[in-house]
Each structure stands twice: as structure tokens, then as C-alpha cells.
Amino acid sequence: MIKVETKTLPAISLGNLDSYIREANSWPMLSSQEEKYLSEKLFYHGDLNAAKTLILSHLRFVIHVSRNYSGYGLLQADLIQEGNIGLMKAVRRFNPKIGVRLVSFAVHWIKSEIHEYVLRNWRIVKVATTKSQRKLFFNLRKTKQRLGWFNDHELELVAQELGVKREDVREMESRMSAQDIALHHVPDNFREEQNFSYTIPYLKDSLSDFANHVEEDNWEAHKTNKLSNALSSLDERSRNIIHARWLDDSDHKMTLREIAHNYGISAERVRQLEKNAMKKLKVAIET
């Protein structure tokens, strides 16, 4: 198995987290063709430069995932670091022949590492520091397993039952259920190689379909770049016609007659120019 060193990644620390995030976001996302090419170089030839590019181009996704676990009292830098470990494991195991984007494959490994980290550290997180908070913590867990998120009426009942303020119940609920967590014991014999055979009961986050969102965003960015390049290949008049007819954000889209008046040509000629321009754009975008 190919080993990807952690020194491949930019260093993270609490003091330079913002600069790390800026650096991670500065790496361009890969098109599906670029990703496939690099993945094949790594998978078939062990190209570590390809591995490095794949990792660096996906650091932003680890940051995105880690933000959904900020409700546990753990440092984001640590969550990101754990997620990066998952990313590296995913990259060195990714088979480009399986027919999915790397982010779809990697998101499970990223979450798995973050979940393990939360599970290891949850017991030392000081969620409840005062007497009333401790009372809430140990009583709310059982109540929430039965009710889930409290509505106003349930909130009032719980506060009365435990003899605390409504605000205290809501605050503890937020601390405990920021991600609707359910913590489970990980078997002592759990090993890294079992990550796919043993399904970790994921801590529910607000982005369970994260990979789909990322792929959609990635595809949208790719299409936008394609469209921009395609438009630049048109002559100025054709480009202006397309913009006025299809890309203008205002409520009023210009008619063929209005454009014809501006250029001193017939509306039929504008229609022909528009049709030809659309054909050129289609060819440029699809190639």
C-alpha cells in the first residue's frame, strides 16, 4: 500500500488556523478529468506527486466537514487534523475504476477519523461545569433519547421537573445536541483496516449528503469556468447578444427587436447570430 506522509500537508496550529484555511482554500479544485488522471497515476504507478495534488485540492472539504462538529468543545484545528488523516487514508486507497469522485469516497474516511476523535475525547469535554448543568446533563440525555428536540411545551415541562430555568435547559440541549449526537462504544479490537467492514454509528451532522453537495458545487464551478472560456471565444457582438438574452441578471431581458435596434440590423439577423453563438458555446462547453 502506498504511504502518504503527513508532511505533505500544511501545518495546522491554533495560532495559524486562519492562515491554514486560507492556504487550503487557495488550492484549485480538480475537474473530473484531472482527478481521474492523477488518481490513475497514483493507483497504478505510485506517483506521490499525484497523491500530494489530490490531497491538497481536497483540504477545503475537510475544513467544511470539521465545521459540522464544532459543538463538542474540541478545537477546530484538531478536528481538521483528524479529518486530514482520513483524507490521506482515502487517497491512498482510492481506486479510480470504481466510478465515483474522490470526495464521495473520502467523506466517509474523513468523518470516520473525526468521529473516532470525538469519541475518544468526549468524556474529557467539560460540557457540565456547574451543579445545575451536571443535573441537566445526566437527566437530559435520557429525556432526549425519548423526545428528541424539545418544543416549547416540552421545554417548560423539563425545566419544571428538574427545577431549573428554561434557558438552562435550552443551553444544555444545544451543547449536547448541536449535531444530534448519539455516542456509541467502539470495540476494543476495532482496527483501521476494518473501517468499511465495521460501520461506525456516525454522529448525525447537518450535512449528511455532504458529498453530493460538494460534487454539485464542484460541477457548477467547472461549468462556470467552461462557460467563461466559451464566451471569450466569441466575437464581441455575439458575446453581447448572448449576455443580453441569457445572462443578464436584471428582470428585463432584451428582445431580438431591441438588440437589432441597438446594432442597426434586422431582428432576423440577431436571431441568426444568437443561434450561431449558442452552437459555438455548446461545442466549447461539451469538449
Curated annotation (Swiss-Prot):
Region described as Sigma-70 factor domain-2: spans on this chain: 54-123
Keyword Flavoprotein set for record: no
GO annotation, biological process: DNA-templated transcription initiation; response to heat
Domain of life: Bacteria
SUPFAM superfamilies the record matches: Sigma2 domain of RNA polymerase sigma factors (SSF88946), Sigma3 and sigma4 domains of RNA polymerase sigma factors (SSF88659)
Any single GO CC term annotated in Swiss-Prot or TrEMBL for this entry: cytoplasm
Annotated region (Sigma-70 factor domain-4), positions in chain: 230-283
Cell compartments where the protein resides: Cytoplasm
Sequence motif: Interaction with polymerase core subunit RpoC, positions: 78-81
Keyword presence, Transcription regulation: yes
UniProt cross-references to InterPro entries, sorted A to Z: RNA_pol_sigma-70_dom, RNA_pol_sigma70, RNA_pol_sigma70_r2, RNA_pol_sigma70_r4, RNA_pol_sigma_r2, RNA_pol_sigma_r3/r4-like, RNA_pol_sigma_RpoH_proteobac, Sigma-70_Factor
GO MF annotation terms: DNA binding; sigma factor activity
DNA-binding region coordinates: 256-275
PROSITE patterns the record matches: SIGMA70_1, SIGMA70_2
Gene3D superfamilies in UniProt: 1.20.120.1810, 1.20.140.160
Predominant localisation class: cytoplasm
Described function: Sigma factors are initiation factors that promote the attachment of RNA polymerase to specific initiation sites and are then released. This sigma factor is involved in regulation of expression of heat shock genes.
Quaternary context: Interacts with the RNA polymerase core enzyme.
Family: Belongs to the sigma-70 factor family. RpoH subfamily.
Designated name of the protein: RNA polymerase sigma factor RpoH
Native source organism of the sequence: Buchnera aphidicola subsp. Baizongia pistaciae (strain Bp)
Lineage: Bacteria, Pseudomonadati, Pseudomonadota, Gammaproteobacteria, Enterobacterales
